[in-house]
Amino acid sequence: MTDDFGRVDFGAFLAPWHRADSDANFAIHQDLELVEHLDRLGFAEFWLGEHHSGGVEIVASPEMFMAAAAQRTQRIKLGLGVVSLPYHHPFLVADRLVLLDHLSRGRMIFGAGPGQLADDAKMLGIDPIDSRRKMEEAFDVIHRLLAGETVTQKTDWFTCQDAYLHVAPYSNIQKAVTATVSPTGPKLAGKYGSGILSLAATNPVGVEKLAEHWKIAEDIAAENGQTVDRADWRLSGIMHVAETEEQARADVRHGLLYLMNYLSNITPGFAAAPDVDSLIDGINDAGLAVIGTPEMAVTQIRRLQEKSGGFGKFLVLHGEWASTTAALHSFELIAQQVAPHFNGDLGPRLRGYNQTMNSNRSAADITQAAQEEAQKRFEAERAIRTN
């Protein structure tokens, strides 16, 4: 059922994270098969990121990946999660967005961010201290180009001279800006009326920033004549479920410790764990993840609703924690047993079921009476004909 916090739709967010000792080609096609699976299950969105180093996050161009995914899927929205704007000329980003918008017939969502990996920035000769400033400059140009403006702008890292898009977008392209702990993301979202992609929503520090971030977005939106909608606010967190907590914990022995210890080397305040059991205990207890049952997942979403005041999408932060079979089953359980608590499906059905079960068999008695009456009429008609 939905409640005062409104409807929540579900999707998936992939960096993607794959073990560096696995085959890259297999992993890439595994992710394409996953988006097909999620499309069949009715998930609303699938997001994929851009990275260039580390050996784990192996997709360099989410645009190219989503062009392939668009041909394999029918309904699911395809989110670029995210394009690292300081790495690209903003005109070329806008031009590629238009092409992908046409290829997907309007199913693409543009996610923007400053770039995460320090080694990515190092190889490109970019000072990470400047990344957020460059993201803001690029996002402004992309926003204006997609709106049909002609842009002339010169900065210390790009030039646009009478730049315009010679092909119009297929749709009114949705935009979302990443938010973790700093106010940069919600500030940009408010300025341009864009969505927010909260990638640290379950982090103990990030979760306490959620309400503050939304207020920043609303305040900045009001100052700029824009509006922001909670339906376009996406929160993300790790979630792997099975029929029992014991089974879920067994499932993630496949790769959780390996990948989370990788993350400890690129994420501030994230400590490495000595073993998988202490890792699971720690991230479950901190609310950072749900490794457990659908009931535990429902509790997590409700906690995030309380902390944030309400949001429109929850993206399952997915990595190669478990085998392919276990991962697909986890998404099936989320679709069957978690999503209905938040997408409006459960309330009417439970009302109908409870009404029937509390009727003291009145419906069965009415049906039986109608059947007996029909039998009497039939017998009476036959008696008249034989006489």
Curated annotation (Swiss-Prot):
It holds the Pfam family Bac_luciferase. Its cofactor is FAD. Keywords: FAD, Flavoprotein, Monooxygenase, NAD, NADP, Oxidoreductase. It catalyses: (4S)-limonene + NADPH + O2 + H(+) = limonene 1,2-epoxide + NADP(+) + H2O; (4S)-limonene + NADH + O2 + H(+) = limonene 1,2-epoxide + NAD(+) + H2O; (4R)-limonene + NADH + O2 + H(+) = limonene 1,2-epoxide + NAD(+) + H2O; (4R)-limonene + NADPH + O2 + H(+) = limonene 1,2-epoxide + NADP(+) + H2O. GO terms for cellular component: cytosol. Signal peptide: none annotated. GO terms for molecular function: limonene 1,2-monooxygenase activity. Pathway: Terpene metabolism; (4R)-limonene degradation; (1S,4R)-1-hydroxylimonen-2-one from (4R)-limonene: step 1/3. Its EC number is 1.14.13.107. The keyword NADP applies. It is an enzyme of class 1 (oxidoreductase). Belongs to the bacterial luciferase oxidoreductase family. Acts on both enantiomers of limonene by their NAD-dependent epoxidation at the 1,2 double bond forming limonene-1,2-epoxide. This is Limonene 1,2-monooxygenase.
